[in-house]
Amino acid sequence: MAKNEITIENVEGDVNFGKSPEENVASIINIIIGDIVSCAVKIDRIDRTFPSKISNKIDHNNLRQKRIIIQEYKSYSSQIEKAYIIADEQVINGKEIAMSMLNNMYFKALDKFDIDIFDIDMTKIKKHADEIVDDIIKQLRKFIYKSANINSLYKEQVEIGINVVVAHAFVECLILENPNASN
């Protein structure tokens, strides 16, 4: 009879041999994404301009490659506030909880680039802005796919929803720095 033996020497991430307990818990963000992607939108791929307030923030943080998610957000901007209202109806303080989680993801991303959240170094922010946003997207993606209420969405919807939610957090100054609040 064959003997199955596994030797694990160094583990640097999550290891689950079955369904993780956190996968049995629903996510507020999934409610928001589900509502965002369920609406009909007209996507304007020609207009690549941004309102001046958003353009100032993009320039202030030196955001380059990830500007595309802000462009995508423009098509869904009216729907996202409705989605947060629906989240608040289903979960007490749903919007605030989701916003707090996104802000905490930003702080985790800053830590990866050795940026002190209490003494923001704008030189480092400008150098790593796209990477910081990318890290937040990765954190959010991992979080979403580990939650119980993801099953009713298509992967493409989830990916668009992630970009829209992260872009909204950028516009609301939860991620990256507000040009009006810096020294």
Placement of each model-derived feature along the sequence:
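Long, low-complexity intrinsically disordered regions enriched in small/polar
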Residues: 1-34
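Long, low-complexity, intrinsically disordered terminal regions
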Residues: 35, 39-183
